[in-house]
């Protein structure tokens, strides 16, 4: 059993427009990678409100929050136990055209081809196939388990 760490709920957005997935582009010493927009829930804040706030801050885009699609955890390797609740989200209106509060290491915003997600560095990697199934209208598991370092890449 791991030492006690605080649990941090996080709301993440799956925004698909013209078969492309909205993602944050980040860069570290290992190169460029992508994550879903969204972030931590503040005390007293509802998850849909956290999602719309975070997406606006990170991308400059206004979205509405839809249904919960997936839950994935990050219980290892961080100072807290992250629980990501991943929602469908839909673009609304015009964008501000700027990242208001980009994430650490964020270099931009990208629209990734959904059909190619299995070969792109989108993390957590367990989301790749799940998002592809969702975009195709195919059901799959909602609970994706714990994100693990070294999760095998999806390459099929």
Residue spans for each PLM region:
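A structural signal for short, well-ordered beta-strand segments
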Residues: 13, 68, 87-89
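Small-residue-enriched segments and motifs
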Residues: 11, 63-66
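Residues that recognize and position ribonucleotide moieties
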Residues: 7, 14, 34, 61, ...
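Nudix hydrolase/Nudix homology domain
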Residues: 31-33, 103-156
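Conserved N-terminal beta-strand and adjoining loop/helix that marks the start
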Residues: 1-22, 71
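Residue-level preference for beta-strand/loop junctions
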Residues: 5-7, 32, 79-83
């Amino acid at each position: 059993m791991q030492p006690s760490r605080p649990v941090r709920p996080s709301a993440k957005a799956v925004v698909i427009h013209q078969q492309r997935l909205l993602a944050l582009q980040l860069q570290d010493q290992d190169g460029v990678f992508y994550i879903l927009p969204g972030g931590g829930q503040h005390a007293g804040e509802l998850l849909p409100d956290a999602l719309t706030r975070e997406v606006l801050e990170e991308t400059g885009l206004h979205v509405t929050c839809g249904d919960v699609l997936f839950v994935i955890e990050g219980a290892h390797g961080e100072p807290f136990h992250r629980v990501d609740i991943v929602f469908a989200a839909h673009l609304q209106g015009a964008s501000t055209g700027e990242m208001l509060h980009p994430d650490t290491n964020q270099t931009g915003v990208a629209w990734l081809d959904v059909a190619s997600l299995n070969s792109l560095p989108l993390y957590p990697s367990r989301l790749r196939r799940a998002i592809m199934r969702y975009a195709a209208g195919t059901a799959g598991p909602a609970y994706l388990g714990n994100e693990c370092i070294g999760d095998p890449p999806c390459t099929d």
